[in-house]
Amino acid sequence: MAIYDFIVKSENEKTSKALEKYQKFWTDDEDKYDGMTLKEFKKDGDPGDKVYQYPPLDVDVKLEAFLGEDGSTEIRAYIENGTEEIYVGTAAKTKAKKILKLLQEIDPRITGELYGGKYWKMENSGYVDDRWKEDLTVRVYLEW
């Protein structure tokens, strides 16, 4: 598996259907994804979850990274077709630029906006980010 392949796991039926046009993959049970082999993943995962390879992107994507309270950087990617939002996951702050570089190798149209600092470190503020509703979430795990 190339370092910039994606694993997409959708927990939402509508999003799963939207992703079905992409080619499903898993060729080698010895390959590990999220620390598990394919067999382990299928056994452990929700029966409704589906795993897909994300092809080279053919839509515009905006990438953002936010500094989390634990010092990690949350990477968010938006597919600019008005219907999909992708949550890419968390990564150490030092890896955020590396992830952006890998995404840009897939599709140079991906733009990066790296944010951090006090604004996004909402400690004890009661701030609720309602832009990320569960029914819009697609979880994407990057191998690096």
Question: Which residue ranges define each predicted feature?
Answer:
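Conserved active-site motif detector
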Residues: 1-144
